[in-house]
């Protein structure tokens, strides 16, 4: 097995939840420490709008542009924290389908890192993981509580 084959790749899913920045920090620090890499995935949910194709196309293009901007911001933050250049992917679809596809396509992914809100509903990705992904993914999952401080994350990583 070559050194490249043994690198750990951490999959993180960009979203607008407050706990995502905790996920980004932990994955960045840990990947830096173990000589790994990060795959930053942004998922654009399927458009619900079906009346006029041209309006749907405009909405999808706006969503794609916003996703590109967010991914660039997050990739810059990963670089700032760890010095690593994240691999970035933007896909359209249902989150559980896209995550399953990415993991099936990229055999270098060793760990899925998700964030969870600690008060009430743990968040859409954790709920989806629990209901769907747990049955099809055969890899470790690290869940980062949204109430961890940066100091706690740095100590853990």
Report the location of each language-model feature:
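Active-site phosphate/pyrophosphate- and oxyanion-stabilizing loops and adjacent acidic/basic residues
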Residues: 28, 76, 101, 131
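Helix-adjacent hinge/juxtasegments
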Residues: 59-87
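General small-molecule cofactor/ligand-binding pocket signal
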Residues: 39-41, 87-91, 142-144
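Acidic, proline/glycine-rich short linear motifs
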Residues: 42-69, 151-157
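Short, well-ordered secondary-structure micro-motifs
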Residues: 23, 50-53, 100-101, 124-125, ...
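Gly/Ser-rich helix-loop-strand patches that form or flank binding pockets
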Residues: 105-157
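Structural beta-alpha unit
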Residues: 1-2, 80-112, 157
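Small/aliphatic-rich secondary-structure junction motif
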Residues: 2-54, 136
